[in-house]
Amino acid sequence: MSLNQLKAPRGANRAKKRVGRGQGSGLGKTAGRGGKGQKARSGNMHFEGFEGGQMPLQRRLPKFGFHNIFRRELEEVKVGDLQGLSGVVDPAALKSAGLVRGNRDGVVVLAGGELSSALTVKVHRVTAGARAAIEKAGGKVELIPAPQTMHQKAKAAKKAAAQAK
């Protein structure tokens, strides 16, 4: 077989839908849009969530809560998940083991499961139950500072610039 003989399998490519080209095509006259009305006209359609002028659901329901832009999203790891690891357990080791993705603001270890081997766990946050389980197994916990957010970096730079004057 050569390049000039390559062909898509039957049914892989759908024929182009040619509308408004006579009654015989099945898509003539109104071109598959039905009769008159807003949806038959050219131009923009109404927006998603539009209910024909009726007060839409997203405006009928009350607003509540707020979104904290400074919130830290931590990746969670249970103590039982650390069982297969050895030595020093840090975010890089957890990522290589496939326990975290490494695209959040840090790692938190939660209580859950048993731990039999002594580990040195270096994470951003640890719950009291998880700390007790790690220390009971003969390990130790070291907290590492959370990576700075862009807001914190800007604030620190501004403070340093003010002190330099």
Swiss-Prot record:
One of its GO terms (cellular component) is cytosolic large ribosomal subunit. Keywords: Ribonucleoprotein, Ribosomal protein, RNA-binding, rRNA-binding. Residues 1-44 are annotated as: Disordered. One of its GO terms (molecular function) is rRNA binding. GO terms for biological process: translation. Residues 21-37 have a biased composition (Gly residues). It comes from the Bacteria. Belongs to the universal ribosomal protein uL15 family. Binds to the 23S rRNA. NCBIfam families: rplO_bact. PANTHER family: 50S RIBOSOMAL PROTEIN L15, LARGE RIBOSOMAL SUBUNIT PROTEIN UL15M. Part of the 50S ribosomal subunit. This is Large ribosomal subunit protein uL15. The gene is rplO.
